[in-house]
């Protein structure tokens, strides 16, 4: 019999990113490369931009394979959106750096979210994590419609019988 987690237990688990790395403050690429090696933890203030302030980067977790939801952080971006990013002919780490540095700030989105974007991509930083004020890299992804992302898949979808 499995015990249901209380809200307090869920909050504690969500806040437990693992080891806290402070030596990568302002060293975004080094922070991401380190997290790719250790696959756990959070790098505090790894990125800073004048219009949004400091951003922490956590290893996080990929989407739940059964629901396709719930992922966050660098692990989520690399696992769940890495192939989309490679379609832009960028290494995912370099792509994240590019968007963090040069993406246009769009503050018209959801509450507690910062959107940095271009014509075909979006990176999201959350400003609150389970009720705690913290700017954390959440996700990055391709905004192109399926037909432009993956023309082969779009052709297959058009050929599929209608239900």
Q: Predicted regions span which residues?
A:
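Ribonuclease/tRNase effector modules and their secretory precursors
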Residues: 1-163
């Amino acid at each position: 019999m499995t015990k249901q987690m209380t809200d307090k237990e869920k909050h504690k688990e969500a806040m437990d990113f693992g080891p806290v790395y402070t030596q990568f403050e302002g060293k975004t690429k080094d922070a991401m490369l380190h997290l790719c090696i250790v696959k756990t933890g959070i790098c505090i203030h790894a990125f800073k931009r004048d219009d949004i302030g400091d951003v922490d980067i956590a290893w996080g977790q990929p989407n739940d394979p059964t629901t396709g939801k719930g992922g966050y952080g660098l692990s989520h971006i690399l696992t769940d959106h890495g192939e989309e990013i490679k379609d832009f002919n960028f290494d995912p780490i370099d792509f994240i750096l590019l968007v963090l540095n040069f993406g246009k700030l769009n503050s018209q989105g959801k509450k507690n979210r910062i959107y940095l974007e271009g014509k075909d991509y979006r990176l999201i930083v959350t400003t609150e994590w389970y009720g705690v004020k913290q700017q954390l890299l959440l996700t990055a992804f391709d905004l192109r419609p399926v037909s432009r992302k993956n023309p082969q898949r779009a052709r297959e979808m058009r050929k599929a019988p209608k239900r």
